[in-house]
């Protein structure tokens, strides 16, 4: 039985000294940085209705055991090495996946952004799925 966390509003802007979350984590507020967080032992998702204007990177995050939903975020993913489930990159400008070795599920992309990604060094257990998303770079889009 996993523990679940949900960060709401703007009370927490960093994970500070926390290195691991043992469970699922949902973020519904604006983050500044990931502090020392390197592993999430469950799903990690960002709310689809909050634009992460201050979060420039998820560094030092290396592993998400479950699904990782980064829809409507634009943070650098250069430290990310493994996602155990699906990786949702729809409506993002998260193009630097240079450390990503493995995705245990599907990768979801906005069709208009797909040419910006290189998955040649990534083992993908599922498939790459494309979506016809309305997309405005560095802005929250509803559809």
Language model region names:
Residues 130, 142-143:
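Extracellular/surface-exposed low-complexity segments
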Residues 2, 23-33, 42-55, 66-76, ...:
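Concave beta-strand-loop units of leucine-rich repeat
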Residues 10-19, 31-38, 53-62, 74-81, ...:
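Short, T/G/N/S-enriched strand-turn elements that build extracellular solenoid repeat scaffolds
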């Amino acid at each position: 039985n996993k523990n679940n966390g949900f960060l709401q509003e703007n009370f927490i802007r960093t994970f500070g000294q926390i290195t691991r979350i043992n469970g699922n984590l949902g973020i519904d507020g604006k983050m500044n940085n990931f502090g020392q967080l390197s592993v999430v032992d469950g799903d990690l998702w960002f709310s689809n209705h909050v634009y992460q204007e201050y979060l420039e990177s998820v560094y030092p995050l290396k592993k998400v055991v479950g699904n990782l939903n980064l829809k409507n975020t634009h943070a650098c993913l250069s430290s990310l090495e493994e996602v155990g489930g699906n990786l949702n990159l729809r409506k993002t400008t998260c193009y630097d996946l240079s450390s990503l070795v493995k995705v245990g599920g599907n990768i979801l992309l906005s069709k208009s952004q797909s040419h910006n990604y290189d998955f040649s060094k990534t083992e993908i257990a599922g498939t790459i799925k494309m979506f016809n998303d309305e997309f405005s770079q560095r802005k929250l889009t509803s559809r």
